[in-house]
From Swiss-Prot:
GO molecular function, one term: DNA binding
Recorded GO CC terms: cytoplasm
Keyword Transcription: yes
Pfam families linked to this entry: TACO1_YebC_N, Transcrip_reg
Assigned protein family: Belongs to the TACO1 family.
One of the protein's GO biological processes: regulation of DNA-templated transcription
Xref: PANTHER family: TRANSLATIONAL ACTIVATOR OF CYTOCHROME C OXIDASE 1
Organism: Amoebophilus asiaticus (strain 5a2)
Coiled-coil ranges (or none): none
Subcellular location: Cytoplasm
UniProt cross-references to InterPro entries, sorted A to Z: Integrase-like_N, TACO1_YebC-like_2nd/3rd_dom, TACO1_YebC_N, Transcrip_reg_TACO1-like, Transcrip_reg_TACO1-like_dom3, YebC-like
Protein name (database record): Probable transcriptional regulatory protein Aasi_0624
Amino acid sequence: MAGHSKWANIKHRKGANDAKKAKYFGKLIREITAAVKQSGNDIEVNPRLRLAIQNAKGANMPKENIDRAINKGSTADTADFTSVVYEGNASHGVALIVECTTDNLNRTVANVRAAFSKHGGSLGKNGSVSFLFDRKGTFSINAADVKDEEALTLALIEAGAEAIEHDQEEGYYHIISSLEDFGSVQKELDNLHLEPVSASLQYIPQNQVELNEETLSKVMKLIEALEDNDDVQKVYHNIANNTE
């Protein structure tokens, strides 16, 4: 089952409801704006912006929304953004890594700490749980764009891909690479004229914990509270249950 594998956290999924889609768009817009503010609006020299735009396109964000986010990042009076990662524990050995992009660190850490406290978790120090995860490059591409699966597999493995999965139900190929080979796999996808619908560096759990229904419900309330925070870009966990 997908929920019991390393693929569960990285899959690009279709059919999000309107509220979740709007929230996700907001996070994508913030990442585009932050990327431009940090390194300019030229995707040829700003890989962070390139990934952010790629992911926005993969989520079917309208071009005008993307352009507005780029223009906002180019404006001098737009606040500077900082990327920060928090680590903590939920109930029953669940480890959480929370990636944020914020223009106010004090606000963000206060809100993240409050979410952990309210839902029975505890915010830890840097390094408190990250050793339980591996930092990996991940890509999702439309299966319909792939003409020769064997050729794709050979080319990507040669470029440094560690694993490739064809998710026939969702209609995607999912690819995992090491942190070091992320750029070379991305370049090979360019050479193959395959544009990912999502591409990012993620935290993949080394081992996972199975939760009973009651505990899972409690932990998911914490994860959802964190994800509802506009400053939070992504929450990673080591739950084995299918959390979709």
